[in-house]
């Protein structure tokens, strides 16, 4: 088994969920996260004062799947989450030794 973690734009969450469902993924975890990479944030004006927003809002989608599904799931996430702009996100894959139901 492997855990696939994808950090994506919040607006792409519904598309990614639908793509994962098409792949046969039946469970996932979604977490709101903040961070930056090459995008580095942006500057915003509010009531005449300039503010720097350095940590951007993203969504982390986590799925634990059989290793045989890994390539299909990664391709589905990439296709659904990609806009072609800087800040589309990252995908991380880690091995899972065991998953225990509580």
Question: What kind of region is each of these model predictions?
Answer:
Residues 1-102:
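Positively charged, small/polar-rich N-terminal and surface patches that mediate targeting and assembly
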